[in-house]
C-alpha cells in the first residue's frame, strides 16, 4: 500500500472507531442529501495539497469535515439565546469528533509513522437549503516518510 493510501486508510479507521461517527467518505466535499443512504454525523476526508520539504518527507495538507443534520423544534418559545434547533449540540459534538481524530494522529505518530502538525485551523461550517447541517472543518499538515525513494538509487 502506498503512503497516500495508508494515510487515508489510517484516518478512515480512526474516524470509524469514533462512536459519534456513522459515515466516513472521501468525496472532497460534503454532498448532503437526506434521501441518500448516508447516516449522520458524517466525516469527509480529503487531501488539499502536498509539498516535499525534504527528500525524505512528503507533507500533505488534510481537511476533515464533520457535520450532522440540524433538527428544528417547532414549539414556540420566548428564549432568544437558544435557537429552536440542535445547532449548538451539533457544533459541540462535531468539534469533539475532529479533535479526537486530530489528537489520535498527533499522538500516535510512532505507531503510524504519520506526524500531524500542531495548531490545526478550525472553521465552523453550516449548510443551508434543502439539507441544513452544522459542523466543523479542520485543516492540518501531516508529514509522512518518502519510503519509495532512496538516496542509494539516485
Locations of the language-model features?
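Oligomerization/assembly interface segments of phage tail-like spikes and tubes
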Residues: 56-73, 133-146
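Small/polar-rich, solvent-exposed N-terminal microdomains that initiate assembly or binding
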Residues: 1-57, 108, 153-154
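Secondary-structure boundary elements
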Residues: 17, 145-149
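A solvent-exposed, charged loop/short amphipathic helix patch at secondary-structure junctions
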Residues: 72-90
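Acidic-leaning, charged glycine-interspersed low-complexity segments
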Residues: 22-23, 32-43, 88-143
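Short, charged, solvent-exposed linker or helix-capping segments at domain edges/interfaces
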Residues: 74-78, 149-154
